[in-house]
Amino acid sequence: MTFAFVFPGQGSQSVGMLNSISERPEVRATLQEASEALGEDVAKLIAEGPAEALSLTTNTQPVMLTAGVAFYRAWLAAGGAAPQVMAGHSLGEYSALVAAGVISFKDAVPLVRFRAQAMQSAVPVGTGGMAAILGLDDATVIKVCAEASAASGGVVEAVNFNAPGQVVIAGASDAVTKACELLKAAGAKRALPLPVSAPFHSSLLQPASEKLKGYLAEIEFKVPTISVINNVDVQILNDPSAIKDALVRQAAKPVRWQETIQAMAVQGVTQVVECGPGKVLAGLTKRINDQVTGVPVFDEASLNEVLATLK
């Protein structure tokens, strides 16, 4: 069986998300490394919260990276095999690149904190938003967003193509509101505003891409030891400078998740393991391709369960 690992991004965090594996030595070491890299107690933040602090993007990004890497290290320490290919949803791509040996964890933790700060500062809080659109095809969502942009005078774009009939839009708050109205009129089953602080992956985040470019120039990237399919081009890259460029563009470009899972299927992947808190990506997998199974590894019990099937 060919299997892949995928790493979740923002939105899957929860207080206590590492409790079941926190006594594992490799997990304790990961938490210690993250705390030293940030100069604050990451283990305490994850274990105790509060949820409001965990949901601030400047905290969410480093703690979700830490959680994804902790679960991956726990998997390997328990005797799990390395996957043939990996990917990560948005921030999760950084977790995948750490697991693939491209970025050291020590460098990645402050990098994603910087990414979060750059993304948040690109658009003033309260002026941008996101919404999940359910029940329409991608082409309709793209077309209606263009109409909403024209009608409102603000930017609104499709930014996460997560599964058939599940697209996330982002942009200026008024434009997102207008798009939700028009999308409901066009037949959307639901248009749900998301509790986020910035219009992630929209072109409004171009200033964040520029800042990231400067920061990434100072960090050493290595050739990956495991293939990683990137969000922005749905490509497997080996050249470290090309990987950096893809991450720069990723901040202000859509996450092409449906295509990512389909690309894995083309490579013969039959099982996708979601490595980290939550079960969102595992749930999306079957909806994208019914020949591929999605299984989550989000606690000690699920780790052992999946390990037994993939050893």
Regions of interest found by a model, annotated:
Residues 1-4, 221-231, 236, 245-249, ...:
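Cys-dependent protein tyrosine phosphatase-like superfamily
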Residues 1-141, 194, 271-301, 305:
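FabD-like malonyl-/acyl-CoA
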Residues 10-12, 38, 100-252:
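Alpha/beta catalytic cores of group-transfer enzymes, especially the acyltransferase/condensing modules
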Residues 22-23, 147-149, 184-186, 287-290, ...:
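Short, solvent-exposed amphipathic alpha-helical segments in soluble enzyme
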Residues 76, 184, 265-268:
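Non-catalytic positions within long, well-ordered alpha-helices that form the structural scaffold/packing
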